[in-house]
Amino acid sequence: TDADGKEVRASGLISVPQKAAGAKSPVLSYQHGTIFKDAEAPSNNAVASEVSVVLASLGYIVLAPDYVGFGASKGTPHPYLLSAPSAAATVDFLTAARTWRGQANVADNGQLFLTGYSEGGYVTMAAHRALQASGSTHLQQLRMVVPGAGPYNVQSTMDGLVELVRDEQPVLGALINPGFLRYLGGSAQREVRRLLLRALLPGDADVTYDTRFIDRFLADDVQYIA
């Protein structure tokens, strides 16, 4: 699902280790870090150096969701730092991959692991929380969760982006405080949003990011900054 809860066609990469016939493998869901080009999405980059492929060489069945906004869903804004759609991309891929394994006769040993780095660390924690809240059958197989270097404190992450904008635009940057932007006009709000997004996205990015993570921070919407 996207940030509005609407169903979208999503994609990802499944990497299967070479083992003797009938051998069973643990399942590892790997959530990738922040990327800015669709060609870097796992399903578009199935090469030997891709992290998920390397992990599969260690004996895991590795699932690597592209995330909404990449792969089959390119064109849909990527829900960066929005926990619900981020978690859904991982949990839905877990379910789809389980169905595929049954159809392809790829045996797993009933063990599930979650890991991710950078944005993938955030997505991993969001997915773990979603599994706990739903009581999903995947939770019964979950053995370990290892998130790494993620922007778990979204407030702090956004404060870092604000500092980058303040360095570039000190006058406008002085006005950027959570909750204060509501008192500015629409043009000022759009400019602040543009500057914050530019601080994150490189100029050659070929995907779009949903700006709600910025809007919620600027609105001081603590309930959703998580």
Regions found by a protein language model. Name each.
Residues 80-103:
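Alpha/beta-hydrolase active-site loop
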Residues 15, 30-34, 65-68, 115-119, ...:
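Active-site-proximal beta-strand/loop segments in catalytic clefts of secreted hydrolases
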Residues 3, 43-47, 77-85, 115-119:
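Alpha-helix capping and helix-loop boundary segments enriched in small/acidic/polar residues
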